[in-house]
Amino acid sequence: MSNADSNPASVIGQTKDLLETVYKRILEHYGIHYQEKANMTKLLSQVNDVLGLTPNKQDRLNSLGLISAKILGNLNQVANGMNELRNQFGRGHGRGHTQEGAVVVPRRYANLAVGSASVLINFLTETVQRVDQCKASEQIDQDFGN
């Protein structure tokens, strides 16, 4: 965020790169293969699948499941929006001053990108911890014949 005032487009690009890194690390953690040049949407889809976060995996017979399905769908949109924001306004493609997309991005968009990504990353890492705890608990039950 220290660059948000002087170079918000760079912050947006770095935030998108961080999200992509988190997705890939989660997939690697679970031994899931991904295409090295897979787009953000595909990577997030794989992450959601391995963590059981797809909206269709939620129990829609109760209020929590219905609400979770909505929120998870919106999280996907946040991630997709981050990708679009970076592609349009980020510095990942080395735009010159006269090229399309070389507009000055207001700091508030860098703040939005970082804030949204932070929430998503925290949620994903907490979910990884929970999934790992559940798997460990299942292994303990199997070890003791439960």
Task: Describe the role of every protein-language-model region.
Residues S68, L72-K135:
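Charge-enriched, short contiguous segments at helix-coil
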Residues M1-G73, Q77-N80, T127-G145:
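Amphipathic alpha-helical interface elements
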